[in-house]
Amino acid sequence: MCGRFSFSPVIRIIEERFDVKVDKTQYKPRYNCAPTQNLAVITNREPCEMKYFRWGLIPFWAKDPSIGSRMINAKAETIREKPSFRIPFLKQRCLVPADGFYEWKRAGSKEKIPYRITLADRSPFAMAGIWDRWKDPEGRQFYSFAILTTAPNELLSGIHNRMPVILSRDQEKAWISDTDPAE
């Protein structure tokens, strides 16, 4: 499970790497992005602008927003089957920019050792995400997201049994396009 990540590049690097406009008044480097925080995403609806959504998907049909704190990740293998994720997977996809993520390896029955995982060159990358919009009883809108996870690659399999879906640059464009996400 991906439960923490970092996103700390300077604005110029973000704008060049993701071809987006960054609101300088909103962006702050984050070294410990955590569930329920408002974090940067790039959506299929507005792919040229960085938005800030709450981490923890609140489905549009939820009666209470607290469900979101339990839905920070979505398994890529079963995403089409889960009612909370099915519509966002088909229509509301996003990139979750990062420059590292954290996984904890169990060492014995009580201890966990944290690992920060980055690309070899430490450059920013995008994790696949889905988003949704929820309205509270007063009509206020809240935007939230979840990160897709998959089985770990060979490098991570000794640390954890899941990892975020990390997209190549070509996959990023396809992920936030209007094409079928399964392609």
Question: Can you describe what each PLM-predicted range is?
Answer:
Residues 1-183:
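Short linear sequence motif anchored by a di-proline
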